[in-house]
């Protein structure tokens, strides 16, 4: 029987760590391509005929594969030995399992997932991780070790089952960051129970309740984060993560006066499979049989990361009978007059190739929702649907995988928290392992490749 202490002998285990920002710097194909990452290796997906999900290994990956960990007392070698932060996932549902798959696909992550809290126990957790109706079969080797532990490709992960965060063994396991994925503990007192239990930081994977919890959207305001800002932060909602990046572009380039948004959103676990009681009478109706109008705070929440837009945006959601992938339809009045649809799309293309690379994409191909399944981008602009009316009214449509894409941003935010951790900041690499090596060894033969 594995004990809690068995997973916590080393406070912060050492591991080879590559570029912290590499997770946000990718090489992309033209038009409607997704991050060129071998998704099939860890999600079990098969690409459609329209979009390629898998890729060849990049030069960066080839270099990374050749790096070795620095032995104790040995001379410097390529590869920085830095600490990893221990992570707990509280709530092993859709976002919790997507987060684990996304994290598993990043070999350079500064995070070490050591435990999940799941009310179903080891058998349920491993089965649902391995076999997923949306993602397909997880290609990793998932095994049950005992009734408290499972492994992914040999990496042990503990399973605990307790609905009360105060009773979770975060102190005993030395947990640094909790990924709060239950959707229940979204305010200060609730999420704060993880801190009381011994965790250092909490990332809420939902909109937070209360003005005391800062919200961050990667690509929009994540640079505002600092280790001492707060111990509890929110990654906002999937829809806010889709909306905020391209709204930022529109406001910076054209100036937003006001606007409304509709998200046509796949049904979620908060709805009923068959008609049944629910506090929202519309969500009480069968999710797979109806278009369900409901509320969303996504548009208003944009002002949490773009304060200048407070009071300028609002919207609703239409829940539809699809299990995954959603689409935002935004209509705004703009200050700049005389623009064309191509002007708007070019602004998005510029941002997608620059400051929002890896977060925003532009698609020129007439695709449908399933083609955006497992897209790593927060939002993908459907350029053919961009419209301009009267020179000062703009309509933009953007696709997003409300599970996978959102979970990638949760990993990004957790990486950012790790990279800002006191004592680890100096260990952050440049984003290119060869570049880091050449800074200290400019005369090395390999470094001449970059001269």
UniProtKB/Swiss-Prot annotation:
GO molecular function, one term: glyceraldehyde-3-phosphate dehydrogenase (NAD+) (phosphorylating) activity
Major subcellular location class: plastid
GO biological process: glucose metabolic process; reductive pentose-phosphate cycle
Residue range of the transit peptide in the UniProt record, numbered on this chain: 1-83
Localization in the cell: Plastid, Chloroplast
Record: residues binding NADP(+): 94-95, 118, 163, 402
Entry EC number(s): 1.2.1.13
Family of the protein in this entry: Belongs to the glyceraldehyde-3-phosphate dehydrogenase family.
Name listed for the protein in its UniProt record: Glyceraldehyde-3-phosphate dehydrogenase B, chloroplastic
Organism: Spinacia oleracea
Gene: GAPB
């Amino acid at each position: 029987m594995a004990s809690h202490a068995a997973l916590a002998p080393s406070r912060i285990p050492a591991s080879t760590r590559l570029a912290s920002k590499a997770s946000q710097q990718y090489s992309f194909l033209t038009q409607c391509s997704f991050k060129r990452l071998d998704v099939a290796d860890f999600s079990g997906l098969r690409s459609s005929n329209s979009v390629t999900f898998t890729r060849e290994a990049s030069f960066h990956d080839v270099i990374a594969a050749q790096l070795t960990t620095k032995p104790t007392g040995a001379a410097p070698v390529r590869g920085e030995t830095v600490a990893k932060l221990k992570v707990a996932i509280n709530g092993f549902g859709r976002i919790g399992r997507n987060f684990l798959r996304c994290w598993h696909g990043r070999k350079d992550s500064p995070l070490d997932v050591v435990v999940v809290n799941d009310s179903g126990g080891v058998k349920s957790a491993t089965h649902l991780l391995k076999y997923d109706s949306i993602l397909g079969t997880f290609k990793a080797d998932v095994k049950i070790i005992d009734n408290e532990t499972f492994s992914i490709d040999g990496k042990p992960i503990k399973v605990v089952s307790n609905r009360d965060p105060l009773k979770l063994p975060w102190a005993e396991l030395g947990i640094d960051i909790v990924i709060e994925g239950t959707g229940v503990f979204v305010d200060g007192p609730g999420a704060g129970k993880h801190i009381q239990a011994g965790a250092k930081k909490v990332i809420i994977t939902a909109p937070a309740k209360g003005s005391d919890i800062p919200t961050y959207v990667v690509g929009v305001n994540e640079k505002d984060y600092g280790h001492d800002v707060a111990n509890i932060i929110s990654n906002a909602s999937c829809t806010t993560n889709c909306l905020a990046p391209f709204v930022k572009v529109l406001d910076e380039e054209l100036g937003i006066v006001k606007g409304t948004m509709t998200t046509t959103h796949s049904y979620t676990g908060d709805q009923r499979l068959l008609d049944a009681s629910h506090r929202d009478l519309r969500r009480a109706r069968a999710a797979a049989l109806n278009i369900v109008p409901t509320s969303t705070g996504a548009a208003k929440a944009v002002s949490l990361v773009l304060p200048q837009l407070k009071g300028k945006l609002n919207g609703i959601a239409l829940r539809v009978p699809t299990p995954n992938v959603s689409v935002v339809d935004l209509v705004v009045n703009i200050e700049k007059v005389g623009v064309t649809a191509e002007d708007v799309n070019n602004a998005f293309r510029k941002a997608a190739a620059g400051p929002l690379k890896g977060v925003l994409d532009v698609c020129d191909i007439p695709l449908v929702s399933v083609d955006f399944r497992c897209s790593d981008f927060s939002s993908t602009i459907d350029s053919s649907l961009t419209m301009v009316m009267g020179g000062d009214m703009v309509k933009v449509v953007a696709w997003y995988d409300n599970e996978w894409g959102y979970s990638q941003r949760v990993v990004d935010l957790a990486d950012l928290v790790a990279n800002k951790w006191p004592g680890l900041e100096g260990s952050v690499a440049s984003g290119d392992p060869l570049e880091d090596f050449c800074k200290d060894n400019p005369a090395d033969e390999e470094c001449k490749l970059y001269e």
